[in-house]
Design a protein with these regions (language model features):
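Structural signature of tandem alpha-helical TPR/SEL1-like repeats
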Residues: 80-93, 114-127, 149-162, 183-196, ...
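Structural marker of alpha-solenoid helical repeat scaffolds
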Residues: 97, 131-132, 166, 200, ...
Length: 269
């Protein structure tokens, strides 16, 4: 029985952009901080972030037209409210106002990924990579996740590793790499990296689901149950929770059957 639990469709949610609500602020410099703080893939000094200081606004951010910033902010807001289709209207407007707006192209890719539009997502991520000169981690993660969705794991691996060079602290990125390695059947590497991802981000439920898949492939039902329990503690009502509970029951039956076989063998004279 194939018990693998698929997380592919959740990549779009995994790559969504967290926001800081700034509805009452109208100063253009403040508005531009949305660009710096919005995506999850920035590489600012963690010590500066931990002290709560805002990164300085670069000359590039200051060069972005106000209309582009406002459209981008609206697009990110719609994306955060689970309206990827609605976000695209604003994000496309932002990119038309500022053609090198690589953050907007990246967000478009995330929206298209969540809508299940693979080719459109790929084009948007590639535009973001090109516009940033390859120095922005977000679209590399997005493209790698898309390729994992398409089971193009060999192609995905170097792209994800490039993203991790740019943003090594992004926990979900390590999970995406582990997913690619799992797809390549490099189970030891996948297990190590998925475990590291779960430590980097203790709330990253999908890392436990991937570890469960690794143990399913190894027929290690005891460890599978440990990871499924961890996943369900974090996501008791998640989109894959029903599958996880079915896998739990299957693993328990397999373990019970193993115990019966062992006891029968021990009872033989």
């Amino acid at each position: 029985m194939n018990q693998r639990l698929s997380a592919c469709l959740l990549f779009g949610a995994l790559l969504s952009l967290p926001l800081t609500t700034r509805g009452q602020e109208t100063n253009s410099t403040i508005a531009r901080r949305t660009i710096l703080n919005g995506p999850s893939f920035q590489t600012e000094d963690p010590a500066e972030i931990s002290r709560g200081t805002s990164p300085s606004v670069s000359a590039r951010e200051l060069s972005i037209p106000e209309r582009a910033v406002k459209a981008y902010t609206k697009g990110i807001d719609r994306l955060s409210k689970n309206d990827p289709a609605g976000s695209l209207i604003h994000l496309q407007r932002a990119a038309s106002e500022f053609p090198n707006f690589y953050e907007a192209y990246h967000a478009m890719g995330v929206a298209q990924l969540r809508l299940g539009h693979g080719e459109e997502a790929r084009q948007a991520f590639q535009k973001s990579i090109d516009a940033s000169g390859g120095h922005y981690a977000g679209p590399h993660f997005g493209l790698g996740a898309l390729l994992c969705n398409q089971q193009k794991f060999t192609e995905a691996e170097p792209i994800i590793r490039k993203a991790l060079e740019l943003a090594p602290g992004f926990g979900p990125g390590h999970f995406i790499l582990a997913e690619a390695l799992f797809g390549l059947n490099r189970l030891d590497e996948a297990q190590q990296i998925a475990h590291e991802a779960s430590i980097r981000d203790p709330k990253l439920a999908l890392a436990h689901l991937l570890l469960a898949n690794i143990y399913i492939r190894r027929s290690d039902y005891s460890e599978e149950l440990v990871e499924l329990d961890a996943y369900l503690r974090l996501k008791p009502d998640g989109p894959l929770s029903g599958q996880a509970r079915e896998a739990q029951e299957y693993a328990k039956r397999k373990l019970a059957g193993s115990v019966v076989i062992i006891e029968a063998a021990q009872a033989k004279p």
